[in-house]
Amino acid sequence: MNMKKCLIALVLLMSVAASAKDFNDVPSAWKWVGKNEVALTYDYSFTGDKDFSVNAVTGKVTEGINYPAKFTDFPFRPEGAVNLTYSPDSTKMAFTRDNNLWVVDIATKGETQLTFDGSDVILNGYSSWVYYEEILGRPTHYCAFWWSPDSKKIGFYRFDNSEVPVFPIYSPFAEDADRSGMGLAYSQNAGAAVALPNVSPTGGSVRMTRYPKCGDNNPKVRIGIVNIQNGFTAWADFDENDDQYFGTPFWGADSESFYIQREPRTQNTLDLYAVSPVDGSKKHIYHETYKTWLD
């Protein structure tokens, strides 16, 4: 996709989100489906997905367009795949499994594992709760990886939750209870499950999740760019020990830079960097500061 189309698509996505009621502000999927036509899908919390068509020339928005081959359909789904995502050239799909990042070739169905340290507290390409809820947004469905336009690289966030406090969340649904017949407080990227004898196996359960309250430790974040042809990961030149937030990243049209937004935890300064997928070095692009805070 050329730069003109990228800019048009960005403007269209922003305008549709701004003018529509009850939208999440990020579409869950979008794709060019004609020379001047963009298809978008938005998630609704209670009523499901809704499709739109946007004409890039006239700006006309049409609701309820259903294309014969919905662009979120997949030819197959690898076992355990989470956030299955097409490459821009439609020859591969990326996904996470067991908190590691994978890619699968559509023609051969051959899978390649790209990260290897995923665990209950190390999440590769899958958001820690605070990033899902407060930064990347719920419409991402915890997805924290991004294909390059040339389909040769994937940028991703690696979250270390080991210092984030564990917080219990009660679920009223019986299907969330431990199948063994005991009440169980079980882990959602939290570490170990904890038996709770007074929890009814048919009346609900308690989920333990990594949840940073105000002043608690946030997850440490590293930003990786993996070359899917040779498996090499270049790590962006940021200190993961800094108390900071990274916003939603984006690729340059030439796939030569991965653009990262960074803020300190006080959120009164915003810096934009271009990160090299070759060695992870960063170039400062933009700086903004405000006396209170920046969104």
Where are these regions (language model features)?
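Repetitive helical segments and hydrophobic/amphipathic motifs
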Residues: 13-14
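Positively charged n-region of N-terminal signal peptides that target proteins for export
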Residues: 1-6
